[in-house]
């Protein structure tokens, strides 16, 4: 997990790839692509080296799976379960947990599902709160694509291969190299915020921005609870905890935390959608100012539904206990009374 080791392994991918095709040389444009990717990897590492060291010192290096692509994940008893982790090489196994997550995310993209790649990355960040790692995510995505490209190249050099098998492995290699270059580029940063009371469909509706626009989502319900030491699904057990989470001061702190995270993600070059009610104009103005400061486009996405439908959704959500939101019918009525409409 040492940054120097991670960097060496990343550069070794390029050296090994160039050597694997000595009997069937790469074309000039393919060699140029490798050169561009190696240069990008070196330059990105220089920018990220300090963050890599910080994560090493802060305990983000763990005994991980090490080979977490989709062929090594199965749905078992209703749960997604990884198997066949790397045991023969500690350097491949003791890694930043983000590297493991990036491997799976990359493989979604490799299978043609960039939408699932972004959904997984956004959900991973939402669950872990590891937003400081976002500047590293793209570097690890590219690294993992190159690892799979190298593995395909190694398979292509094994003896007694049929001509068809050689072509398949070579194509797989070059497709992963092409994906690596694609992953060096992100969607243009921009900022969306939602507007709507509880139950109006904000969380469901913003999935489209994640999958189609590549946005990373920040959810106020989740970040509010994280800020005050609660699990997302944990309900306040008494009036004291209710006040701790939902007082005027707590709401102000929650929006300030969302603003801090949104600014950080935008500066990392990522599009961001903030899923919160934004019923008060002052909070909408706060985020519009962030977009202006970061010089990115800003848009408010409104959500609404009939009151009867809002009530039905809230009752069903509380019955299932399936969401971080603690909204009740009383909260809904308060929101409808205090909502400041868009102008």
Language-model-derived ranges and their functions:
Residues 1-70, 74-190:
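ATP-dependent phospho-/nucleotidyl transfer catalytic cores
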Residues 192-194, 220:
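Hydrophobic anchor at the beta1->P-loop junction of P-loop NTPases
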Residues 197-198:
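The conserved Walker
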Residues 202:
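Conserved lysine of the Walker
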Residues 205, 209:
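Hydrophobic positions on the alpha1 helix immediately C-terminal to the Walker A/P-loop
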Residues 210-270, 308, 312, 316-317:
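Conserved substrate/cofactor phosphate-moiety recognition/catalytic segment
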Residues 294-315:
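Conserved phosphate-donor/acceptor-positioning beta-strand/loop module used by diverse small-molecule
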Residues 316-343:
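Small-molecule kinase domains that catalyze NTP-dependent phosphoryl transfer to phosphate-bearing small molecules
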């Amino acid at each position: 997990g040492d940054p120097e080791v991670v960097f060496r392994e990343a550069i070794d991918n390029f050296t090994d790839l160039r050597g694997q095709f000595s009997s069937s040389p790469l074309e000039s444009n393919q060699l140029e692509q490798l050169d561009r990717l190696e240069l990008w990897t070196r330059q990105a590492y220089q920018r990220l080296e300090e963050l890599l060291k910080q994560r090493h010192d802060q305990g983000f290096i763990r005994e991980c799976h090490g080979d977490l692509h989709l062929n090594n994940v199965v749905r078992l008893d209703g749960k997604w379960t990884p198997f066949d982790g790397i045991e023969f090489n500690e350097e491949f196994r003791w890694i930043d947990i983000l590297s493991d997550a990036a491997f799976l995310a990359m493989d979604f993209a490799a299978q043609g599902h960039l939408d699932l790649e972004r959904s997984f990355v956004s959900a991973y960040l939402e669950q872990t709160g590891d937003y400081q790692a976002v500047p590293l995510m793209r570097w690890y995505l590219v690294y993992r694509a190159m690892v799979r490209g190298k593995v395909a190249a190694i398979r292509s050099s094994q003896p007694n291969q049929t001509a068809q098998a050689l072509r398949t492995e070579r194509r797989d290699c070059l497709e992963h190299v092409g994906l690596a270059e694609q992953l060096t580029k992100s969607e243009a940063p921009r900022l969306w915020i939602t507007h709507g009371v509880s139950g109006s469909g904000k969380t469901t509706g913003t999935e489209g921005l994640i999958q189609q626009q590549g946005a990373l989502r920040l959810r106020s319900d989740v970040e509010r609870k994280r800020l005050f030491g609660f699990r997302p699904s944990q309900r306040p057990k008494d009036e004291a905890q209710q006040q701790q989470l939902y007082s005027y001061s707590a709401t102000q702190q929650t929006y300030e935390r969302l603003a801090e995270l949104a600014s950080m993600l935008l500066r990392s070059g990522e599009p961001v959608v903030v899923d919160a009610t934004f019923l008060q104009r002052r909070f909408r103005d706060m985020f519009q100012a962030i977009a202006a400061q970061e010089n990115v486009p800003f848009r408010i996405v409104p959500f609404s539904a009939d009151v009867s439908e809002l009530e039905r959704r809230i009752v069903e959500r509380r019955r299932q206990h399936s969401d971080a939101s603690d909204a009740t019918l009383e909260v809904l009525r308060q929101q409808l009374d205090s909502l400041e409409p868009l102008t």
